[in-house]
Structure formats: C-alpha cells, structure tokens
Regions:
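Flexible, active-site-proximal loop/turn residues at the rims of small-molecule/cofactor binding pockets
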Residues: 15, 91, 185
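N-terminal secretory signal peptides and thylakoid transit peptides that target proteins
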Residues: 1-17
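Boundary at the C-terminal end of the N-terminal hydrophobic targeting segment
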Residues: 22-24
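Extended, low-polarity segments enriched in aliphatic/aromatic residues
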Residues: 27-81, 94-105, 109-321
C-alpha cells in the first residue's frame, strides 16, 4: 500500500490544510432536492470540448443546480476557502467514456474562484494508471490542482454502513472536507445505471463484494456512510457522450451523443436524470427498458429511503440553460 504520513499530506496540501479535515467543513451546502441543472456541451467521440465551451457548460449547469446567477456564485454557496475539495472521477472505461479533462478543469477553476487554495483541490481515482488512461496528468502537488490515484491507501480498520463493511480511502475519510462525484452517464450490467452514486465504489477496498441484487442496497449504503454523506457537496455528470448499453465498460455500439453536462446537490436526482436519459435512448433504438432487460435500477429507492435524495420522477426538476 502507498501510505502518506500526516506531515507529507500537510506539505502536499499546504500548511494547516489538514486541521480537522476528518470532519466535514462547518459550511453546509444549500441542498436543492430533486433539482438537476443541465447545460449543452457537444463534441464528437474522442474530441475535446473547447475550453470556453467547457467553462460555459460547467458554470451553467452548476448555477442552475442551486438557482445562482453564475457558476462562481454557485461554487461559493457550496465550498468554503478552508475546504480541502476532493473530486472523484470515474475513469473505469478509459478515455472514450470517462469525465473529460476539460470539464473537470472547468470545475476546478470554479472551486478555486471561491478562495480554495489550488493545492487543496485534488482530482482523484483509484489509481494513477486509470487517471492516465483517461487523459489526466498525474500531479503530486499543485497548482493548478492535484491529480492522483488513491493507490490502495485505505484506512487500516473497516467501518460499517448498512450492509457494507469496508476500509475507505483515506482521501475521503481523513483528507478531504468536501467531496464531488464526477461521473459519466452510462448503463451498468448489474445496477442498471452507473452515474454519480456508484462512483463511490471506487473509494472502498472491497467493491467486488457488493454487486449482488443489482448492487442494492449497497450503492446507497456506501453513499450514506458519514465519510460521503456528510461531505458530499455536488454530483456532476458528463453526458457529452453517453452510453445506453454495454456498460460499465466502453462499448462502441452503445454510445450516443447526449450533448449535456448535469450538476446537482441531490445525488439521487442526478442518477434519476441519467436513468431517464438512458431509457429514452434505449426506447429510440427499440431496445427493452433496463428492467425488462434484467437490470432493474433498484438502488435509487433505497437511497431515497435513506434520505439521500429524491427518486420520484414527478418531483424531478430539470433546469436547462
């Protein structure tokens, strides 16, 4: 295991950054249940978004998600200058179906505008290798921001939440005071949908244990652990290129140009929106819905029951900019 001492972490993140980071920041975000902000962002498969397009899309989706006048104003609602902000990206599927670097960097810039030291903004995934495969550059220290794999740096002792018992990455248990899930709009061969919530499987040491019964209630149980629940500020979904069949790995025949970026302070609503878009594309192709295909999306009901967000389609409010 790759372990960093507290002194090494302090040097990496800046003096005083680690004081009290095991607890969530005193700033509690303004949660908007059921609200998902969506902005247009179009690009071809394998092609980058223009920097300005990425900036406008991220700022627009973020502002719409909290009813702010601008992306900067929205970020200031969600993050405090004292935060250590961890952005968990899902790079399992490689470059063709991972969060686009330019969108992630647009979010980093918005967070930095709130006064968060760029050394205290870290983009992370399970390993350096996964980040590099998705097009990210490993950066042990910032600015412009840190980008590293957790690389098996887990707590020594497991903790429980509902039906799960896992060692969590120290990045979420000890280092970060605020978290963002940055996922992709795609289907999953077991849970039906893999968007923002299942991304947190990447911070536990034993995710392979929690795939029975469509990953239910395990996705919800990971997300309701205090390390996640008390620190999660935002879910962002890259839907520039999405996938409706063949996930969670990249499958060329299953991709489609959704051309959207979504943001929400409600992780359940974010995944509900992704589910809706996936089902819409499957219907256009004459494919059975996910339940008929043997992949019912069960975990959202469990997450809503746990108080994590809204799973009722009638209460989903999509604000498009």
């Amino acid at each position: 295991m790759t372990k960093l001492t507290r002194r090494e972490l302090a040097l990496a993140f800046g003096a005083g950054a680690l004081a009290g980071t095991a607890q969530a920041s005193t700033r509690r975000p303004s949660v908007h249940p059921g609200v998902v902000g969506v902005a247009e962002a179009r690009a071809e498969l394998g092609k980058a978004l223009g920097q300005e397009t990425a900036r406008l899309a991220m700022a627009g989706a973020l502002a719409a998600s909290v009813g702010a006048a601008s992306g900067a104003e929205a970020a200031a609602v969600l993050f405090s200058p004292r935060d250590v902000v961890g952005i968990k990206v899902n790079c399992l599927a490689g470059k063709n179906l991972s969060p686009r670097v330019e969108l992630v960097e647009a979010l980093v810039n918005l967070v930095a505008e709130t006064g968060v030291d760029r050394r205290n903004i870290v983009v992370f995934e399970r390993s350096n290798r996964e980040l590099q495969r998705a097009g990210f550059e490993i950066r042990e220290s910032g600015p412009p921001y840190r980008c590293i794999g957790t690389n098996n740096d887990f707590d020594r002792e497991p903790s429980t939440s509902g039906a799960i018992g896992s060692c969590f990455a120290r990045m979420v248990s000890s280092t970060c005071s605020a978290l963002v899930s940055f996922g992709v709009v795609k289907d999953h061969d077991l849970s039906g949908v893999s968007a923002g919530m299942k991304n947190w499987y990447g911070v536990i040491h034993n995710p392979n244990k929690y795939h029975d019964n469509g990953c239910d209630p395990y996705i919800a149980d990971v997300a309701r652990h205090p390390y996640i629940r008390n620190k999660l500020r935002l879910t962002v979904l890259d839907g520039v290129i999405a996938q409706c069949h063949g996930g969670p790995a990249y499958r060329q025949g299953g991709i489609f140009k959704l051309g959207m970026v979504a943001a929400s302070t409600d992780p359940v609503a974010a995944d509900l929106w992704a589910w809706r878009e996936i089902e819409s594309e499957r219907a256009k192709r004459g494919m059975p819905n996910l339940e008929a295909a043997g992949r019912p999306v069960r975990y959202l009901a469990s997450a809503a029951k746990a108080g994590l967000g809204i799973d009722d389609p009638e209460r989903l409010s999509v604000v498009t900019v």
